[in-house]
A protein has these predicted regions:
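PLP-dependent amino-acid enzyme catalytic core
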Residues: 10-419
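Short, basic, low-complexity termini and linkers enriched in Ser/Thr/Gly/Pro
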Residues: 1-11
């Protein structure tokens, strides 16, 4: 945000392990100590021992509960009386709104125009006044800063605040005290503005420096990776990602400095890789993760890091995903796996042609989900008609087998899968 308070180590000291332990004492009774579980299926798939830290089990569905509560508990009676304001794509908004409601503090939240409806409605449900402004979190932040000055509200920064960072770092405490995390080699953590990874990295590196801390960003918005390459926070241009919770134009100064000191590596993942990771978590582990929450699995699955045969923990940072987006992800993921196929078959335009084609498909044990005639808009020559078929299939080899059988029977068949 162009007008955000510039938090640097010259005016505010770097946080320490002691700050994180103090934060844990403050918030422990009011946040969920989230499950840390071993995944046999994902371990087999990834070639290493995979642990999952499930922050989607927090009350508002993400790790943001921790930092938001720690920051709110620091407010003076006067600040509580006037209220707070925050800017967020959803998770920080919900966390601030929920804990403000619990603590009796008035809250106002500015969210980007494209924020998933589920996050907007949830934030309003916690009693916050929601204002939609701008295309990204940074844009919403400019209005939030302005309103904080005009109305005397305390601005609760989503990531560039030591108390927020210390709250997020309490995840590190829960990781290292869990017996499953003994001999842990690495922790993979999503990066947006950098609040989560800077907190976790501080605690882990000051407690057990041997544990590698690896950040994961969406390829579409690699703000931390770009900043580390340049040696200072870099502002990216307009962007969007399935991982909307980490689509941040610029990381915070304090977050950048902590990452420089403690983060071993930052990698990026593509949109299709994120979508596939969301689908695998849902299908294999029955875990609903948002795009930002699944980037860690996407990185491990696609061998972005060399951790074969090691014990690796993935922070699943949140599960607040729009149902419509989840539906699209499921469809796209099934198509990528060859479990849904869409093809166009050109038939002679007389009775029985479609039946003949469908009998071939039936014989190859594909399930027909949808049949659509294109009689009027078709470019087929006179005497022919194009029919689009959506099929449930058993993999890419099965799709090729169906296409070959149709072509062998004289049908022109074209793969039209565009999910």
């Amino acid at each position: 945000m162009d007008d955000e308070p510039r938090i640097t180590t010259h005016c505010i000291p770097m946080i320490s392990k002691a700050d994180i332990e103090a934060a844990y004492r403050n918030i422990q009774k009011d946040i969920v100590s989230t499950p840390l579980v071993y995944s046999q299926k994902l371990s087999h798939l990834c070639g290493c021992q995979v642990l999952l830290k499930l922050e989607n089990f927090q009350m508002t569905g993400s790790f943001k509960d921790r930092g938001a509560l720690n920051r709110l508990l620091s407010l003076s009676p006067e600040q509580r009386g006037k209220g707070v304001i925050a800017a967020s794509a959803g998770n920080h908004a919900q966390a601030v709104a929920y804990h403000c409601q619990r603590l009796g503090i008035r809250s106002k939240i500015v969210m980007p125009m494209g924020t998933p409806l589920v996050k907007v409605v949830s934030t309003q449900g916690y009693g916050a006044e929601v204002i939609l402004q701008g295309e990204m979190v940074d844009d919403a932040g400019e209005l939030a800063i302005q309103l904080s000055k005009e109305e005397g509200l305390t601005f609760i920064h989503p990531f560039a605040d030591p108390l927020i960072i210390a709250g997020q770092g309490t995840i590190g405490i829960e990781i290292l005290k869990d017996e499953l995390a003994k001999d842990l080699a690495a922790v993979l953590c999503p990066i947006g503005g950098g609040g989560l990874i800077s907190g976790i990295a501080t605690y882990l590196k000051e407690t057990n420096p041997a544990v590698r801390v690896i950040g994961v960003e969406a390829y579409a918005c690699p703000s931390m990776k770009a900043s580390l390459l340049e040696g200072h926070p870099v502002r990216l241009g307009k962007t969007s990602s399935l991982a909307d919770g980490i689509a941040i134009k610029m990381v915070g100064q304090i977050n950048f400095e902590i990452a420089q000191k403690y983060v071993d590596e930052v990698v990026t993942v593509e949109e299709n890789e994120i979508a596939n990771a969301v689908l695998l978590l849902l299908e294999m582990e029955k875990i609903v993760a948002e795009g930002a929450g699944a980037v860690t699995l996407a990185a491990l699955l696609n061998r972005k890091v060399a951790l074969q045969s090691r014990k690796v923990l993935l922070v699943i940072s949140g599960g607040n995903i729009d149902v419509n987006i989840l539906g699209k992800i499921i469809t796209r993921g099934l198509a990528m796996d060859g479990r849904i196929a869409q093809m166009t078959v050109r038939l002679k335009d007389f009775p029985g042609s479609l039946t003949a084609a469908l009998e071939i498909i039936k014989g190859l044990q594909a399930n027909i989900l949808e049949v659509a005639h294109h009689r009027f808009e078709s470019l087929a020559p006179f005497g022919y008609v194009d029919v689009s078929l959506t099929l449930e299939t058993k993999g890419h080899a099965h799709i090729h087998e169906i296409q070959a059988a149709l072509q062998g029977a004289g049908f022109l068949c074209e793969d039209q899968c565009r999910f």
